[in-house]
Amino acid sequence: MKVVVIGAGLIGTSIALGVKRAGAEVELIDLDGRAEKLANDLVSNGKVSDPDLVVIATPTSSVHRVIEEFKDIYPKSTFIDIGSTKTKVKVDVQTFGDFSKRFVPTHPMAGREVDGAEGAQSDLFQGKTWVVTPLEESAPESLKLVSELIESLGARVKVMEVAEHDQVVALVSHLPQIISSLLAAQLDTRNSEELSLAGSGVLDTTRIAGSNPDLWREILNLNKEALLPLLKNFQKDLSTLIDNFDVERVLNEGRKGRQSLPGKHRSASRNYQYLPVVLEDKPNQLAALFD
C-alpha cells in the first residue's frame, strides 16, 4: 500500500510511523516546512507517487481546503479524514460531487495530551477503536482500502452513522475534556506548596487538560449541539449534589458507571524497543546511567 499523510502532527505522524512499520510506502506533507521535515525524518521515508490512500490529518476546519488542493493531484486515490466530529466533514465533502465516492470519514479513538510529531508513536492505535462513518456515496473499494489501513495499524473498525458518532463522542471524549479543564483551572489559583501534595488522583483526572487548547476549541465548537445537553445534565447533577450532598449515591453511581467501561485489557500490549547496555561490575554504574 502507498499512503500520503497530509498533516505532520501527532496523529498524522503516528499513522505514518505505523503504516511504515506495516510495510507500506508513506510520505508526509505539511504547510509548516519544519514540521514536515521533522516528521519525514522520524519516519525515514521519501516521496510517494500515485498513493492508494490520502490521509487528511489536519483540523476539521481545514478539510475542505485540503480536498480542494489535493483531489486533482491524486485523482485516483481514496481520501480519509481523522477528525473528532463528522457532521461538518460530511457537508463539506458532498459539495465536491463525484469526489465523495472516494472519500471515507473516519475517527481514530486514540491520542495523547502532547502535540506534534515529537509525541508520535507507531503503536498509538494498537488495540484501539477506529470509527468509520461512510457516506452514502462512498465506494465499496474505498471502504475496503480504509479497513485494510486501519487493521494494519492494529486498530478495530467500528462503523457508525455520522449523527450517532457525534452524539457518542460528545459523552466519551468531549465532555471529559471540558470537565478535566475546569478542574485543572482550579489548580492555577493555588501556590506551589499546596500543589506539592497532588497525587495520582488529580494527575489522572487532569491529564487531558494539558491538550492543545486551539485544537480542542475547534472540536468543541463544532460539536456544540451534541455537547450542550450533556453539560446541562452535568450542571443539574452538580446542583443536586450541592443541595442534598448525597455523596454516597454519587460515589456508588460513579463506581457503577466506571465499571461499565470495557476492561483494562481492551487495549493490546505495546511492542517496546530494547537497547542492550553493558555496565562495568562496580558500584554506582546503574545510577550513573540515569544521571
Task: List each language-model region with its residue ranges.
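NAD(P)+-binding Rossmann beta1-loop-alpha1 motif at the extreme N-terminus of oxidoreductases
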Residues: 1-47
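Short beta->alpha hinge that forms the Motif I/post-I loop of the SAM-binding pocket
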Residues: 31, 58, 82-84
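N-terminal Rossmann-like NAD(P) cofactor-binding module of classical short-chain dehydrogenase/reductase
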Residues: 54-55, 80
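Rossmann-like NAD(P)(H) cofactor-binding subdomain of soluble oxidoreductases
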Residues: 66-117
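Interdomain hinge/lid region at the active-site interface
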Residues: 191-255
